[in-house]
A protein has these predicted regions:
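Bacterial N-terminal signal peptides that target proteins for export
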Residues: 1-8
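Hydrophobic helical h-region of N-terminal Sec-dependent signal peptides
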Residues: 9-14
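C-terminal segment of classical bacterial N-terminal signal peptides
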Residues: 15-22
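Solvent-exposed beta-strand/loop surfaces of large extracellular or lumenal domains
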Residues: 24, 92-105
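Surface-exposed, glycine/proline- and aromatic-rich loop segments on solvent-exposed faces
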Residues: 26-93, 143-147
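A mature extracytoplasmic/lumenal domain signature
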Residues: 59-61, 124-128, 139-141
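Acidic/polar low-complexity flexible segments
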Residues: 76-89, 129-167
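Acidic, glycine-rich flexible loop segments
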Residues: 99-130
Length: 167
C-alpha cells in the first residue's frame, strides 16, 4: 500500500457528524449501492474474540486482489476524530494489512484473507483498542493513477459519522 493513510478529506466531514450509540457484538450493517466504482461497499461486519478484532467487507461487484484498497478509520475515545487506521491493500502481488496512526507510523500488523470474489477479512490485535470504539470504512479506487484518494474515487460507510463497536 504505497498511499499514506492520511489522505482523507472525508475525515473533516466526519468530525462534525453525530456519533451513534454503542452496540452489541458481532454486528453487520449495509451501505447502499451508491457509487459507480469497482469497490462499492455493500455489507460491513465487525467481530472480536479475546485476542483479535475482525472486520469483513463485502462489495456489490466482484473485485481482483490487485484492486483491494480498504481503510477503517478508528476513533478510540469517542471524540469524533480518527485516532488510527486499519488497512487492507495489495503490494508485491499479495494482500497485506497493517494498522497505522494518522502520521503513517505502523502500530501493528494485520492479517488479510479473501472470503470470496466480493469480500475480504482484516484481523488485528485487540490490544490496540480500548473497551469500546467507533469506526468508518472507506473503499478507494484510484481511477486516475495518482495514488491519492481524490473526490469521486471512494465509497464511505457509514455515509456520515461512525459505527460503534462495544468490546
Amino acid at each position: 500500500m504505497k498511499r499514506g493513510l492520511m489522505t482523507f478529506s472525508v475525515a473533516l466531514l466526519l468530525v462534525a457528524s453525530p456519533i451513534a450509540p454503542a452496540g452489541a457484538q458481532p454486528v453487520s450493517f449495509t451501505d447502499p449501492d451508491d457509487v459507480n466504482l469497482p469497490l462499492d461497499l455493500k455489507t460491513l461486519t465487525h467481530d472480536h474474540n479475546d485476542s483479535a478484532i475482525t472486520y469483513t467487507v463485502e462489495t456489490y461487484d466482484p473485485f481482483a486482489d490487485s484492486q483491494v484498497d480498504f481503510k477503517w478509520g478508528i476513533d478510540k475515545n469517542g471524540d469524533g476524530k480518527v485516532d488510527f487506521f486499519a488497512a487492507a491493500g495489495y503490494e508485491d502481488k499479495a494482500l497485506e494489512g497493517k494498522v497505522e496512526d494518522t502520521k503513517d507510523k505502523e502500530l501493528g500488523k494485520a492479517t488479510v484473507r479473501r472470503v470470496n470474489d466480493r469480500a475480504i477479512q482484516l484481523s488485528f490485535s485487540r490490544k490496540l483498542l480500548g473497551a469500546s470504539y467507533q469506526y468508518w470504512v472507506m473503499a478507494a479506487t484510484d481511477t486516475n493513477g495518482n495514488e491519492e484518494d481524490d473526490p469521486g474515487e471512494f465509497d464511505l460507510a457509514p455515509d456520515a459519522g461512525f459505527h460503534p463497536h462495544q468490546l
